[in-house]
Regions:
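A compositional/biophysical signature of low hydrophobicity enriched in polar/charged and small residues
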Residues: 1-159
Length: 159
């Protein structure tokens, strides 16, 4: 099962036949295992990894560190559940260290993300502080390099 998950992480579009060959299983066994993983919630989604820097559309991504006061009943879970329901929040993690939650937030521009942080996120009871960091460039995402070797080639300049 771990080998199948590794294959799917590397290429979610791999055919049942190719996965079966690599794992020395039958396509039917691979299909049944994938079905079981989906039903148990192990496989949550199949997504494309997109190089946002190559798209024409403007999209702003920010990492937001959030300090919160944990609740007596439920700790961080209640406030985390509330925050992750916002559509702007694409990913969210409970962290160790100087802040409690790490959010990845997306919006059409800096102002929209800043307004989300100042008007919506900071006003939630229990949120005691935030620090926002805007993504400038992505070099690697989910194990995938965003530039090939020749993307960075520069023209030689001679005097």
């Amino acid at each position: 099962m771990d080998r199948l998950i590794a294959l799917l992480k590397n290429n979610a579009r791999i055919s049942l036949e190719d996965a079966a060959k690599q794992l020395d299983l039958t396509p039917e066994t691979v299909a049944a295992t994938i079905d079981d993983l989906e039903k148990r919630g192990v496989l949550r989604a199949y997504q494309a990894i997109v190089n946002e820097d190559k798209l024409e559309a403007d999209q702003v991504t920010a990492v937001i560190e959030v300090k919160v006061t944990p609740e007596r009943e439920g700790g961080f879970d209640h406030i985390a559940t509330r925050i992750c329901r916002y559509p702007e929040v694409s990913s969210m993690y409970l962290m160790s260290g100087q802040y409690d939650l790490m959010l990845f937030v997306e919006g059409p521009d800096l102002r929209t993300v800043a307004t989300f942080v100042s008007a919506r996120l900071s006003s939630i009871p229990g949120v005691t502080g935030t620090a926002t960091h805007f993504r400038l460039k992505t070099y690697k995402h989910h194990g995938v390099l965003m530039e090939s070797e020749h993307d960075n080639e520069r023209l030689q300049v001679s005097p």
